[in-house]
């Protein structure tokens, strides 16, 4: 084994790497009681949609002595959907993802591990909409940073898929699925994933609400609703199972899938934003097979019979004034992956 395989090459191969990761809808989201750690036990079916985030991680020119409190200075730019709402600071999951890979690069003695970086996010997923836009940023950043700092796939120091999944779970419950893509059943906080085989393509109209909803706030509202009606609360893991939904997905039957969409967070989301009920009604009147609050909301995902139907439903909901914006998408979509590499030139 060569020295470069152990310690890494002395110079970077790529100036920048761009990766993409897709958003998601929860076709089934069963929520158990709050655990001692504050999280809730989930039983969910994720499906990746064609809406995606693209994240570019680029090395910056060396800038001499660096502040030891900030050994990897980072600059930012964001474009695309809701770009003005994206935090451009260390609270951003993409930044945390890059920092995690930089730590591995330092441990592996990668020569450019302490170089400054520029992160650019091109957004295609609504912010704070329950479709895992921030988690997709993190997943794409993990893939891009891994390729940037560990360009040799043969390197034993390069993090493998299992290690990336562990890092992803530390970043957020939805990040592992955004790495995986496709369709999967998630348990625990949603990070324990079992891929689900499906047939066909599913078409969606998406309705956003610019007011957004805080995920912790929606879970808190669910807990309060259950405390007020304890007879309706699950005693252990979520009552009910998504097995029938999995069967419908395997058969590729959108009409049957529509009957089986479940989201325990829909009621608390509607109680916080009552106008969501009107959006759901407008979707039904426009001819959607079914409509559901996506994740913790407030985005509404409307399952349609075809791509043309999705356009018609999105248009009808928009014309009715029941959404801040509408768009169409399809599912399932692929795993996170590299889409562009810019090599360093002499």
Positions of predicted regions on the chain:
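Anionic-ligand binding region
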Residues: 181-252, 257
